[in-house]
């Protein structure tokens, strides 16, 4: 199994944590598979990833993931972005009552992290802090595309230290 092999490889490489999740075709937490993957994870902390946002019953799903022994759930509160899902994130945190960490993520940035913290009650956040960085290439042959016409081939999204700093500062209420 590919996922299990990746778990073993990550553990062997000294990973501090693992991130994965699995649902059944009907939108339930795939308990048999997750039990197998949790066993393969050993004592390495596991974050159940945003598959959680696609599960059909987040209340039951939360309890199942807690019972599996995961350390965290990464979620946008079953909405396109975590700020939009702040209400469910708050409900999950209250229901979890310290048994698992709810990690708010998706669309989190320096402009919304403080309000998200206040509205959701979350204490941990996942964010990419990406900015568009232009290529040093000055010449472009408009007749030849290397990919989709919808993508700017001379722009890369890169996590920048400055944006990470700004986002953390905003969360802490600093300038």
Segment roles from a protein language model:
Residues 1-3:
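Short, small-residue-biased leader/transition segments that mark boundaries at the very start
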Residues 6:
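Residues within the DNA-recognition helix of helix-turn-helix
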Residues 9-27, 70-83, 120-141:
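Glycine-rich phosphate-binding active-site loops on the catalytic face of alpha/beta enzymes
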Residues 19-21, 47-51, 73-76, 103-105:
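Short, conserved beta-strand edge motifs with alternating hydrophobic and charged residues
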Residues 22-42, 55-61, 79-93, 110-115, ...:
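Active-site-adjacent beta->alpha loops and helix N-cap segments on the catalytic face
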Residues 29-50, 86-109, 151-174:
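Alpha-helix-loop-beta-strand connector modules within alpha/beta enzyme cores
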Residues 53, 103, 122-159, 163:
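Active-site pocket-lining/capping segments in soluble small-molecule metabolic enzymes
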Residues 58, 62-64, 68-128, 155-160:
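Catalytic alpha/beta core domains of metabolic enzymes, predominantly
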